[in-house]
Amino acid sequence: MPPKDDKKKKDAGKSAKKDKDPVNKSGGKAKKKKWSKGKVRDKLNNLVLFDKATYDKLCKEVPNYKLITPAVVSERLKIRGSLARAALQELLSKGLIKLVSKHRAQVIYTRNTKGGDAPAAGEDA
C-alpha cells in the first residue's frame, strides 16, 4: 500500500505543475482559431441612365480632369461603368477630351490642351 501513496503524491505534484504553466508548454492542443467576419462592402447604387444634373456635371467637370477613365468617371459621378464608357465616347466625338491610350480592357483620356491640340492636327495633315 505505501507505494500507491507515493504514486498519488507524484501524480498530484505533476498535475499541480501542469496547472501552473499551461502557456509555456509547447506540446498539446493549440486554441482553435475563430473564423473572422468578412469585410462588408456597401452596395453601390449607381445610375443606369443620366439625369439632367449628372449629364450637366459630365459636360462641365469631366473635360477638366487630368486623368479620365471610365472608372474615375463612374466613381465620381456615381454612374455605371458602361454608361461612363458611352459618355466618354461621346465627349471624345465632340472633341472635349483627347485619347491617350486605347486597350481592349482600359481606355485612358486626358483633357484637351489649348496649345498642344492645333500643332498635332497640323502635323497629321
Curated annotation (Swiss-Prot):
Its main location: cytoplasm. One of its GO terms (cellular component) is ribosome. InterPro entries: Ribosomal_eS25, WH-like_DNA-bd_sf. Residues 28-38 have a biased composition (Basic residues). PANTHER family: 40S RIBOSOMAL PROTEIN S25. This is Small ribosomal subunit protein eS25. It is found in: Cytoplasm. The modification N6-acetyllysine is found at residues 43, 52, 60, 66, 94. The keyword Ribonucleoprotein applies. Residues 1-23 have a biased composition (Basic and acidic residues). Component of the small ribosomal subunit. The ribosome is a large ribonucleoprotein complex responsible for the synthesis of proteins in the cell. GO terms for biological process: cytoplasmic translation; ribosomal small subunit biogenesis; rRNA processing; translation. Residues 1-38 are annotated as: Disordered. One of its GO terms (molecular function) is structural constituent of ribosome. Belongs to the eukaryotic ribosomal protein eS25 family. Signal peptide: none annotated. Keywords: Acetylation, Cytoplasm, Ribonucleoprotein, Ribosomal protein. The modification N6-succinyllysine is found at residues 52, 94. Component of the small ribosomal subunit.
